[in-house]
């Protein structure tokens, strides 16, 4: 009997335990059913996730030696290039260089990077993968400075296609040398080139070419420069030879620039022309106004020197004559000649005054003879001198054999002259005064200087423009 009771008790406990577990299982099952994701929130399979025990890398980078070029030992690998110019930042005449920002893209095929894909879609990577695979070693020939942009991260993109084709793109700013010819400056045009070349691989290992010919170079239509007009962008290619290493493929990005002349017309040509014209003002100033004419000449000479110095400060020191040098120095010569012209006028005027002073010193004293109608002159005076004093024409002078020892000069200061004759004498004296104070050199200079300067400008602009 005790044995039966124990057995019944055990069975009862088991039944109670089974009944107690049934609601809990149902409750957990209900929770699992409510936590099932809807098809709207169903996520795609993450192919980058490494499953435990079954590693499946996307690119078998570790299985190959990427220090070697693709198809090493075989024919040269073709690498296509295209460029999109984002901006032409600056042109420096002093340093003879230019700065350009561009997108540089390379295209090649590396079978070691091929991967199976049912959708035939490419995979895009950032710059971290570039350090693990082979990429072309293209560099800029004659570059002074260059860098890859790194804001907010390195501006490098690598795109790999299932068949192994690779697109490698980066955003670069480069400062390169440009051989400029300033013989026609500022009426010049400059042609600059950005040159690309493989650093290590000759044409036997790497064939560098423009991927789409002339269409491989794209430019932004908004590119503009303050002093230049961009006329043309075009591409070329050729082989470059180095005596130590051999032949290399070299690609050229050529662009032609034409300088805007309006800036230099305002800053250089127009001020120089004004200074030359200002120097002509001295020809209309009385030659006895020494301070006015001297100060005007010095001012124009110093201003021309300042203009020439300012132009040379913004240009490289070249060993040949530029077009602007010809214009400025010819203008400087015109200004300097105007100063020399006044020096000649002043010198000749001084000589004339000395002769007149000596002539007046030979005249006898006229004290007490102011109302006299005539006066006696010594016979040592020439007939022209006596004639000029008396105011008679040459026809009234006696022949030499009939001339007495003393010459009688009738003075014009006679109180008995009629009023009409006095007015005529005053007009004649006024004309004689103007003629004597307007030197002949000044009169000719007023015409000669402008005429020669106009002829020079016609020749200059017809040759250089």
Curated annotation (Swiss-Prot):
GABAARs subunits share a common topological structure: a peptide sequence made up of a long extracellular N-terminal, four transmembrane domains, intracellular or cytoplasmic domain located between the third and the fourth transmembrane domains. InterPro entries: GABAA/Glycine_rcpt, GABAAa_rho2_rcpt, GABAAa_rho_rcpt, Neur_chan_lig-bd, Neur_chan_lig-bd_sf, Neur_channel, Neuro-gated_channel_TM_sf, Neuro_actylchol_rec. It holds the Pfam family Neur_chan_memb. It catalyses: chloride(in) = chloride(out). The keyword Zinc-finger does not apply. Residues 21-260, 315-325, 465 are extracellular. GO terms for biological process: chloride transport; gamma-aminobutyric acid signaling pathway; visual perception. The keyword Chaperone does not apply. It is found in: Postsynaptic cell membrane; Cell membrane. This is Gamma-aminobutyric acid receptor subunit rho-2. Disulfide bonds join 178-192. Glycans are attached at residues 120, 254. Belongs to the ligand-gated ion channel (TC 1.A.9) family. Gamma-aminobutyric acid receptor (TC 1.A.9.5) subfamily. GABRR2 sub-subfamily. Keywords: Cell membrane, Chloride, Chloride channel, Disulfide bond, Glycoprotein, Ion channel, Ion transport, Membrane, Postsynaptic cell membrane, Signal, Synapse, Transmembrane, Transmembrane helix, Transport. Three rho subunits (rho-1/GBRR1, rho-2/GBRR2 and rho-3/GBRR3) coassemble either to form functional homopentamers or heteropentamers. Rho-2 is unable to form a functional homopentamer. Interacts with SQSTM1. One of its GO terms (cellular component) is postsynaptic membrane.
């Amino acid at each position: 009997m005790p044995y039966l009771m124990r057995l019944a008790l055990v069975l009862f406990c088991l039944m109670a335990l089974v009944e107690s577990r049934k609601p809990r299982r149902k409750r957990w099952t209900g929770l699992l059913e409510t936590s099932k994701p809807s098809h709207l929130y169903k996520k795609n399979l993450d192919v980058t996730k490494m499953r435990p025990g079954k590693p499946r890398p996307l690119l078998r980078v570790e299985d190959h030696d990427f220090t070697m070029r693709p198809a090493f030992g075989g024919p040269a690998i073709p690498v296509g290039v295209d460029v999109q110019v984002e901006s032409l930042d600056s042109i420096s005449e002093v340093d003879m260089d230019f700065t350009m920002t561009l997108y540089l893209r390379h295209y090649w095929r590396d079978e070691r990077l091929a991967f199976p894909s049912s959708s035939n879609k490419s995979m895009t990577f950032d710059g971290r993968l570039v350090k693990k695979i082979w990429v072309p070693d293209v560099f800029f020939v004659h570059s002074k400075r260059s860098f890859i942009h790194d804001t907010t991260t390195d501006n490098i993109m690598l795109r790999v296609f299932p068949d192994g084709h690779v697109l490698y793109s980066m955003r670069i700013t480069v400062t390169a040398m440009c051989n400029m010819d300033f013989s026609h400056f500022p009426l010049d045009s400059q042609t600059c080139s950005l040159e690309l070349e493989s650093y290590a691989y000759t044409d036997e290992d790497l064939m560098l070419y423009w991927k789409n010919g002339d269409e491989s170079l794209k430019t932004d239509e908004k590119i503009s420069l303050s002093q230049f007009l961009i006329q043309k962008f075009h591409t070329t290619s050729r082989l470059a030879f180095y005596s130590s290493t051999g032949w290399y493929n070299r690609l050229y990005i050529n662009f032609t620039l034409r300088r805007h002349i309006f800036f230099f017309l305002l800053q250089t040509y127009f001020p120089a022309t004004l200074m030359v014209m200002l120097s002509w003002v001295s020809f209309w100033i009385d030659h006895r106004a020494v301070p006015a004419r001297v100060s005007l000449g010095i001012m124009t000479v110093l201003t021309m020197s300042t203009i020439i110095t300012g132009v040379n400060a913004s240009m490289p020191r070249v060993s040949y004559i530029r077009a602007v040098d010809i214009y400025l120095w010819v203008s400087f010569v015109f200004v300097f000649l105007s100063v020399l012209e006044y020096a000649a006028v002043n010198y000749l005027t001084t000589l004339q005054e000395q002769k007149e002073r000596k002539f007046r010193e030979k005249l006898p004293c006229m004290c007490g003879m102011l109302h006299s109608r005539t006066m006696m002159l010594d016979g040592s005076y020439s007939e022209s001198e006596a004639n000029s004093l008396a105011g008679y024409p040459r026809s009234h002078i006696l022949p030499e054999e009939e001339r007495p020892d003393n010459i009688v000069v009738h003075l014009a200061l006679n109180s008995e002259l009629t009023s009409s004759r006095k007015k005529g004498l005053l007009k004649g004296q006024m004309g004689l005064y103007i003629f004597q104070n307007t030197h002949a050199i000044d009169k000719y200079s007023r015409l000669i200087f402008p005429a020669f300067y106009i002829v020079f400008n016609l020749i200059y602009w017809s040759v250089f423009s």
